[in-house]
Amino acid sequence: MSGRSVRAETRSRAKDDIKRVMAAIEKVRKWEKKWVTVGDTSLRIYKWVPVTEPKVDDIDLKVTDENSGLLRRPKPNAKKTKNKKKTKDDKCGSELTTPENSSSPGMMDMNDDNSNQSSIADASPVKQENSSTCSPAPDQNVSAQPEGSEVKLEESHSNASEQQDSEVSSGQNSHSSIESSLNSSEKAETQTSGDKEITVEASKNSQDSDDGTPPCKKVKGDSSQPNNDGI
């Protein structure tokens, strides 16, 4: 029995504590910090003040700006807003009753179509003029192409003639080189033959000198021998 009574007491205390906490929360919710003037003076203090329940008209005044977090400026009274709405309605009614707007939407569409057609008609001669001005360009291109082809043909002919001249000059150079080589070989042969003759004469002279008789006497002796044979 003692245990049950203790549990009952704790439950009642817990309930009392919960009630106190809820009362404190509600009290805190009804308080806010605001700048308040002290009496009739211009002195202002930032302190906790109980929240006064706002009226329906003042709900919009306390809507905070999402970006700045500041209170927005107070909106005009309901009477002023009603007057503004009336003036806007009057203006809209006057615009609707004007003779320009009195025409049906079908007429407006017709006018728009006519204006579009006229603008297209005005733009068509401009396009024709542009096409006429642009048309001579292909003729110029066609005339420029044969000129370019003629220039290319002349260049090819000049290149061919230059190649022929180079071939002729190379052939002449080859002929001249062959002739010079032949002349040099002939000169070498003549020099070698002359050297051989000189060596033969030198050998004969050396033989005569070995015999001790002068060459003139030898010649005379050789000529007298056939005469004696004839006698």
Curated annotation (Swiss-Prot):
Residues 72-86 have a biased composition (Basic residues). Pfam families: BCL_N. Residues 174-185 have a biased composition (Low complexity). It comes from the Eukaryota. Transmembrane segments: none annotated. Residues 62-231 are annotated as: Disordered. Residues 186-199 have a biased composition (Basic and acidic residues). Residues 95-105, 113-146, 158-173, 222-231 have a biased composition (Polar residues). InterPro entries: BCL7. PANTHER family: B-CELL CLL_LYMPHOMA 7 PROTEIN FAMILY MEMBER A, BCL7 RELATED. This is B-cell CLL/lymphoma 7 protein family member A. The lineage of its organism: Eukaryota, Metazoa, Chordata, Craniata, Vertebrata.
